[in-house]
Amino acid sequence: LGDAYHTALICARLNLADGIAAYEQSLRDHCRRSAKYAYDALETVGLGMCAMLAALVHDMGKACERFMEYLEAAFAGKDVRRGSVNHTFAAVRFLLERYWEPAEQGSVRIWTAEIVAYAAGAHHGQFDLNGPAGGHGFEHRMTKKDICYQEARDNYLRECADIKELDAMFDAAAGEVERFFETVSDNIDIAEEDEECDFWTGLLARLVLSAVEEGDRRDTYEFMSGKAQPECDVGNDGWSGLSARLDEKIAGMECRSEINKARREISRMCREAAQKPGGVYRLN
């Protein structure tokens, strides 16, 4: 790599300063800040390392020359298609290649690899592992051609996080997943096909994904706006205030079209129904 490309490689995004000059955020900084925020989101429930690992590698696919060319073209105002450079598959492929071992089928490490890979790969949209029309989400991401995977992986491991650090994180994440399943039920056997296990695994994967999205979106906002997002610890006492703010926001929205009028009426009915005592109700 030449010096010019080596410098550009670490750039995750570009922005305007004072409307004229560009300033950069390195891929390393973005990944690590996202990982820190993701960790903070789930640390209190014992899943911080799962979230941190997924967020740390989520943008691995950006560590290639093709993405830098796309970023610079978009910044220059050229006609580029958003999302035309695939950057979400690389993390999935890396995690499954590195940590998914067929000999360990049904083990905690297999489940951890899949949960973290899904959370990293779905940060711009969830995907089906087994779609209604066939196909497998992981297999598709493992075999997709022309995504600059090897280039992105090698550059990422050199610039952002080395393999030793990632291996240690994965070991810690596997410990969290094991404790999670021990906590939720004594009747779940992750080595067996079990609907209850699948249910909890789906919830866990979405929880880790939500932390990745929180870290990614928060760091992106802070970089693009130049403003630090204040820490917010809502707690139980904060829900009434948040509910009031939501009601105020909704009340200020226009309600002119028939569909929006219907939506508002449905919301009103739901709010009234929430005041009823607990029980089994029929939707009609």
Give, region by region, the residue ranges found by the protein language model.
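Dynamic helix-loop-helix/coil hinge segments at AAA+ ATPase domain boundaries and subdomain interfaces
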Residues: 23-27, 251-262
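Intrinsically disordered, low-complexity segments enriched in small/polar residues
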Residues: 17, 276-277
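A conserved cap/lid and substrate-binding interface adjacent to the catalytic center
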Residues: 239-242, 259, 263
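Pre-Walker A adenine-sensing motif
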Residues: 264-276
